[in-house]
Amino acid sequence: MASPALISETEAWKDLKAHLEGIKTTHLRELMGDTERCQSMMVEFDNIFLDYSRQQASPDTINKLYKLADAAHLKQKIDRMYNGDHINITENRSVLHVALRAPRNSAICSDGKNVVPDVWNVLDKIKDFSDRVRNGSWIGATGKELKDVIAVGIGGSFLGPLFVHTALQTDPEASKNARGRELRFLANVDPIDVARNISGLNPETTLVVVVSKTFTTAETMLNARTLREWISSALGPSAVAKHMVAVSTNLPLVEKFGIDPINTFAFWDWVGGRYSVCSAVGVLPLSLQYGFAVVEKFLQGAHSIDQHFSSAPFEKNIPVLLGLLSVWNVSFLGYPARAILPYSQALEKLAPHIQQVSMESNGKGVSIDGLPLPFESGEIDFGEPGTNGQHSFYQLIHQGRVIPCDFIGVVKSQQPVYLKGEVVNNHDELMSNFFAQPDALAYGKTPEQLKKENVSEHLIPHKTFTGNRPSLSILLPTLDAYRIGQLLAIYEHRVAVQGFVWGINSFDQWGVELGKSLATQVRKQLHASRVKGEPVEGFNFSTKTLLTRYLEATSDVPADPSTLLPNI
């Protein structure tokens, strides 16, 4: 008998639907009272501890989710990814970001070819180049050392490397290696982002890394041309070869731009942008800032989770458990969002990166076979470090909409602070909130409890917390390069699990194309109106009105302006 075309047509899905009502009427207060249940919902790997006992789920729920995973052929899909099969069928590509952090002696194939040697050729080239820049043997056009780096990219070429950079900045080993150096990321085509990036920097000591696979990405290439002008206007056109390098596959366009192809670092079609932080996209700028040895530890951490994900049984497999619970929360309990709440300021850019990884991967409305999905998939991801978020949006999480939460804590702070006479140290104060918030969400506070506390009758409705709000807790032992790599890979694979179970293609992103094509039409109109004075035509009334208003208000912009760079 053929497998159902949609996962929602399987008996496992229908069984979970039937199971749903019993769970909805069982409060987390009751579920948390079952010690045996709680113990069964705690998993540890390599000193990473996952506690998902505060999920709205019973052991029976979890077993039914395992059956759903089997019905979705989850294990086979994971194996196909690792085997280099073209699981991204709309672009006919392998999905092999795991190869980017594989040990040198590994064998991971795409189209019958082991890609690991190619990966390590690029890594070796990055190590050699970053070492030369850092030790001063590669210098700028005027003989000065290149201490400052601006990485130019957008989307996955920006958010992932920025997350890792921000997480490493306060790590003792990494911060020591980065002394006297500066790493910035230019992503937005907004000239304000250009101004902020070049502010305080000297072109003589600045190296620009342009990240674009095709070297045609509109925003990235406009920013790259802007920085090329910034360098050449200060140092002369010939300086570009010493002050700009590329991460790209399009060597002819790189050379035409003025960058020596020798100073180009490759990556491959089997690497999606949002999964590319472990390629030259992230490894090159991060190695320039922190040294290759630190970044290699990051890659090793990611690889450790790759191995865990591919080999651990589902009941002990952290990414699988997280992915299945997300499917349960989104498609069965009907919760459309997820809050990512790291209790570490070093992880302040985790949520924005995972927002892209998750929402670009799983924001799909059709199955991998092109069938409309009759259920909700994907979730809205957002977050902020604790305790900052507690003074921002936790009000809604506690007393408004139900939003499942990921609490991420770190046992040992990167930068401990102790003050004599304080009841607890700074990190203990932070972690007190990490441990308290999940219980507040799960248990809430009843009117009866408030009455016993002699709360005024008219305030009781306002101070009541319904509880029964699901969360999970991830406890990391430390936050060094290795652990940062592990955390990244956990979330990458979690997203893949969700997509595999929902039966969607998590590795394409056609949703970004329509807006880009319409922007091309607008761009042509702006040029025609500014240069030739042509009226706005070919748009709906709303867009025509807005465009006309914009053009009239910027009529002082010259049709053929001379170069003007930010002055800040």
Swiss-Prot record:
Catalytic activity: alpha-D-glucose 6-phosphate = beta-D-fructose 6-phosphate
Active site positions: 360, 391, 516
Main localization of the protein described in the UniProt heading: cytoplasm
Top EC class of this enzyme: isomerase
Annotated EC: 5.3.1.9
Metabolic or biological pathway, per its Swiss-Prot or TrEMBL entry: Carbohydrate degradation; glycolysis; D-glyceraldehyde 3-phosphate and glycerone phosphate from D-glucose: step 2/4
Coiled coil: none
GO cellular component, one term: cytosol
Keywords: Cytoplasm, Gluconeogenesis, Glycolysis, Isomerase
Keyword set includes Isomerase: yes
Pfam families for this protein: PGI
Cross-referenced SUPFAM superfamilies: SIS domain (SSF53697)
GO BP field: gluconeogenesis; glucose 6-phosphate metabolic process; glycolytic process
InterPro entries: G6P_Isomerase (IPR001672), G6P_Isomerase_C (IPR023096), Phosphoglucose_isomerase_CS (IPR018189), SIS_dom_sf (IPR046348), SIS_PGI_1 (IPR035476), SIS_PGI_2 (IPR035482)
Cellular localization per UniProt: Cytoplasm
Gene Ontology MF annotations: carbohydrate derivative binding; glucose-6-phosphate isomerase activity; monosaccharide binding
Origin: domain of life: Eukaryota
PANTHER family, alphabetized: GLUCOSE-6-PHOSPHATE ISOMERASE
HAMAP family referenced in this protein's UniProt entry, alphabetically: G6P_isomerase
Similarity section: Belongs to the GPI family.
Subunit structure: Homodimer.
Name this polypeptide is given: Glucose-6-phosphate isomerase, cytosolic 1
Organism: Clarkia franciscana
